[in-house]
């Protein structure tokens, strides 16, 4: 966790080598690092601006916290979503609650067509995976999707915010991927087979798990002026979040400009495999796994799991040796 380690970055190979060395020292029977060449998605440019009724440019970054010097480290990325499409669009903003299909049904009942709009959705209320929100927005014909963490679910509406408590501070961003891997799991270009060197790869345009909609996360601090300017009908009571504004559906008054340029190409990624062969049932498997890449430092996700896994393999290695 000493530095950011996004998937396919050079730092992730260092972490794979650290895990492999730890397992060898712990006494696992075999330890192997496997290289897979996978489709990688990283941002070159992510920009948002409100151009009407007033001009406003959000920071799209997390503010450093004086009590936590690590939040000021270089290399911390701003707002971005892996596997967002690239594009440049100016369109009206629309608030679509959690971005689930029933929310778009409600928008239409209110006379608002999401097609061609930039939809703003919440991470919760109720929860759904950001990739499902993106697919739903894409199917609805939206031009882009902004997903933000409302303080009602992750912020001062729940209690004290970091560093005084566990909840998200005002500028906190929830980065993540939106690949439709719940439809086709694994590397998008090798559906159903391993993404090893020399493997057949389909074109990105044919990969059903690669979104065709632009998407990015924002903090509730950044999104508040935009939500406050939306205008249009009042949102249903169940859609109201924790910001001190009138939650409206938008549709015409507020116009947003979103420009995203993603670098999408095939890059190496590393998987570490360690084995302890059973003495009584060597042909039966118990599989334990955890990813080791992270959106930033990964103190919670994934490194809490990595630390737990390393302690477990240490215990299992000791048992195997004895």
Where are these regions (language model features)?
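Short acidic, gly/pro-rich beta-turn/loop elements at beta-sheet edges
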Residues: 43, 58, 104, 129, ...
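Extended, regular secondary-structure scaffolds
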Residues: 132, 140-199, 205
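Soluble metallo-hydrolase cores and metallopeptidase-like ectodomains found primarily
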Residues: 67, 71-106, 184-300, 311-314, ...
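Catalytic-core environment of secreted peptidases
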Residues: 1-11, 20-26, 30, 50-51, ...
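Noncatalytic luminal/extracellular "stalk/propeptide" segments of secretory-pathway proteins
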Residues: 2-115, 125, 163-165, 169-185, ...
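Short, surface-exposed beta-edge/turn micro-motifs
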Residues: 91, 115-118, 142, 213
